[in-house]
Swiss-Prot record:
Free-text domain note: The cytochrome b5 heme-binding domain lacks the conserved iron-binding His residues at positions 155 and 179.
Family: Belongs to the cytochrome b5 family. MAPR subfamily.
Domain Cytochrome b5 heme-binding stretches: 118-217
Keywords: Cell membrane, Lipid-binding, Membrane, Signal-anchor, Steroid-binding, Transmembrane, Transmembrane helix
Residues forming coiled coils: none
Region (Steroid-binding): 120-217
Protein name: Membrane steroid-binding protein 2
Length: 265
């Protein structure tokens, strides 16, 4: 059987032949049963030694050198290989990602000032505590009771969802959950039981969460240039005059009757 080594150390020489010679060579290379192969049936190849054998030989030489070396030399060689591997891996490793810039901590909002008692003030005076002046506390009233809501400036301060209630007695608006300007008043007449219950819940929430700092002073409404107090006083004076007039009339009638009685025999 014809055999040939798989690899050769030197490249093979390719010879181009004429067509006729190629046909003769092909015909002579066809194997027929009962016909012996030319050249003894052996195909020779002048290939050199396989490169794999050289590698195996080098490994064997290194192994023999390691066996003959002293333990100190072996340990030193292993340590050197480890150092080389460490250095090589560090050089080939991808660079670390750039450090992210350190974010400066945001400035925290200063805590709200301590509640200050304002005492008894009018509704007009309460308007100046609607949050437009940051130096003043943020106040709001329910049923005439004033509370300091400065700690909830995000809700009741300028731009907040309930900023419309700040600086006012918003009892009716809270009871009806209304944002209409005509409901921003302390007048709770005509409210339903459900609305009064909602207002009571709001009052409980405010009294338990916020500090009460004052009350709203009741101002009598003027009508026709005279206040209600003047009207009451005038009514009292008129009443006293009527009583006095009635007494005088009764006295005159009594005196007339006495005179008539004295003329009779």
């Amino acid at each position: 059987m014809a055999t040939c080594s798989a690899a050769c150390a030197r490249p093979a020489v390719v010879v181009f032949a004429s067509p006729a010679a190629a046909r003769r060579r092909a015909a002579s290379s066809v194997y027929l049963p009962g016909r012996p192969l030319r050249g003894g049936g052996v195909v020779r190849c002048s290939a050199g030694p396989v490169s794999g054998g050289m590698i195996s030989k080098k490994v064997a030489e290194l192994w023999a050198a390691a066996r003959s070396a002293s333990p100190v030399a072996v340990i030193a060689a292993v340590a050197g290989a480890a150092v080389v591997y460490k250095v090589g891996s560090s050089l080939l490793a991808p660079p670390p990602p750039p450090a992210r810039p350190r974010e400066e901590p945001s400035e925290e909002a200063p805590p709200p000032p301590e509640p200050v008692q304002v005492g008894e003030i009018t509704a007009e005076e309460l308007l100046q505590y609607d949050g437009s002046d940051p130096e003043k506390p943020l106040l709001m009233a329910i049923k005439g009771q004033i509370y300091d809501v400065s700690q909830s400036r995000l809700f009741y301060g300028p731009g907040g969802p309930y900023a419309l209630f700040a600086g006012k007695d918003a009892s009716r608006a809270l009871a009806k959950m209304s944002f209409e300007p005509q409901d921003l008043t302390d007048d709770i007449s005509g409210l339903s039981l459900l609305e009064l219950s909602a207002l009571q819940d709001w009052e409980y929430k405010f009294s338990s969460k916020y500090v009460k700092v004052g009350t709203i002073k009741k101002v009598l409404v003027e009508q026709g240039g005279d206040s209600t107090a003047d009207a009451i006083e005038e009514a009292a004076v008129d009443g006293e005059d009527s009583i006095l007039t009635a007494k005088m009339s009764n006295q005159l009638l009594y005196e007339e009757e006495m005179e008539v009685g004295s003329d009779d025999p």
